[in-house]
């Protein structure tokens, strides 16, 4: 197993992650709306002015539907959703504008250091392992790498990468969500290193792998759908004469398709993962308990909260990821290590 695929994947993922970080932050804020600890404070940062003549609406994505169930008394955690009169649609763009207005432009890059560390650990690992398995499992005579085999390689690579990158993932979610919390509950982490250190000391080392079962499953779904779709669509385009292996158009089309497939497939488990990682303590009995409470209190479409920013983030992220990856591969093709 060579080191070069890990380096190539890591470089591409860091660039893609840093450039699309604001979209990921907006996605996290929208996914956390409706959770008991989420703040709709009209001015969470008192040092920044806010025009109180403009109503601030709850962060609900366009696909969210009001729950017809209401509060369930049998659930151990009672979360009372806002009344229908206070619920309204707020687009990802409006959420981003609200963050800039109330927290400042720099808030869109809250947790970017954690994103960079996460990509170094998670994406470099998953892409390196996928490349290794691809080389091992591709038929040497025909060059055939079946779709089912691609998906299997993606599932394995995603699982390993997620375990390695989970501490950075927890830190990233905490740092991205911090601005949405009431002032007295904010963690105010100085950096990803400070976040990981404080989480480990205050909540125990095991808390760095909080939600790891979800992270593993999400990473398996994302990696399998993302990498397998990219390779497969690319092969179809080339075989059909609609593109060349090294063509930019081929890379753009394949990466865009991969981003959309990954976003739709992973959003439900991503929402649950975000809720569990953002919790300061174990308020949920597990992933299933978290999902049940969300659906009961916020409606079934709560599992697709943040789908629009997820898709608008996954699309550009995946396109930048693979376009950069192809260029890095070209630059390092003659380098041996």
Curated annotation (Swiss-Prot):
Membrane-traversing stretches: 6-26, 105-125, 151-171, 210-230, 252-272, 304-324
Repeat (Solcar) residue spans along the chain: 4-136, 145-236, 246-331
UniProt xrefs under PROSITE patterns: SOLCAR
UniProtKB keywords: Membrane, Mitochondrion, Mitochondrion inner membrane, Repeat, Stress response, Transmembrane, Transmembrane helix, Transport
Protein location: Mitochondrion inner membrane
GO molecular function, one term: dicarboxylic acid transmembrane transporter activity
GO biological process, one term: mitochondrial transport
InterPro entries the record matches: Mit_carrier (IPR002067), Mito_Metabolite_Transporter (IPR050391), Mitochondrial_sb/sol_carrier (IPR018108), Mt_carrier_dom_sf (IPR023395)
SS bonds (residue pairs): none
Membrane topology type: Multi-pass membrane protein
Sequence similarity: Belongs to the mitochondrial carrier (TC 2.A.29) family.
Function comment: PUMPS are mitochondrial transporter proteins that create proton leaks across the inner mitochondrial membrane, thus uncoupling oxidative phosphorylation. This leads to a decrease in the efficiency of oxidative phosphorylation and an increase in heat production. May be involved in protecting plant cells against oxidative stress damage. Recombinant PUMP6, reconstituted into liposomes, transports a wide range of dicarboxylic acids including malate, oxaloacetate and succinate as well as phosphate, sulfate and thiosulfate.
Protein's name in the database: Mitochondrial uncoupling protein 6
Organism, as annotated: Arabidopsis thaliana
Gene that encodes the chain: PUMP6
